Amino acid sequence: MKVFFTIFIFSLFPHFFIAISNENGQKRDESSAPKVDSINQLHWLVGNWEGPLGEGVLGESWLPPRGNTIAAVVRLTNKKGTEFVELIKIEKVDESLELRLNLFDLELRPLEENPQVLKLTNISEKGVVFKGVSEGAHRRLSYKINSEDIFEIRIITTDGKKIEIDLKRV
């Protein structure tokens, strides 16, 4: 009888029991992405950011939101020159956000045939989290401005490597 009751409850509320914790420890239903009113909710990204990454310097320039998108040009440089250039586009799709990124070599040839595609999983006043949905995409990518105006980028790559990057406004 207990087994039947448990199965019955789960069949009535299949998504009720599927919950994950976001960065603030709050639980939310994993079956639905957070709703976004406007791409302007990401206005805090706008500006030029720079900081160390390995032996080089990572620079990001974020353009103001316009036309349901916000976009960035990213460049990694070191003593030898430019390692790569990356384009990032975050677009409001329906009531959520989709991030697409692609890396390019020095001749501006894409390093991958298709861009990485990531979908919104969490958004706050000065933070946003995406999960990879395309083949070869990062598992997770988050951006956050902390209380000291540091731009925190956190990545979990497709193979599970964790990368932490902190940039300052320039």
Regions found by a protein language model. Give the residues of each.
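Positively charged n-region of N-terminal signal peptides that target proteins for export
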Residues: 1-4
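Bacterial N-terminal signal peptides
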Residues: 6-15
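Sec-dependent signal peptide cleavage junction
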Residues: 18-40
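Edge beta-strand at a domain terminus
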Residues: 27-31, 118-120, 145, 149-170
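N-terminal helix-cap/turn-to-beta initiation motif at the start of protein domains
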Residues: 34-48, 89-92
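Central antiparallel beta-sheet cores of small beta-barrel/beta-sandwich binding domains
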Residues: 52, 56-134
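Glycine-centered tight beta-turn/hairpin loop motif at sheet-sheet or coil-to-beta transitions
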Residues: 53-55, 136-138, 158-160
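Short beta-strand segments
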Residues: 58-60, 86, 139-141, 161-165
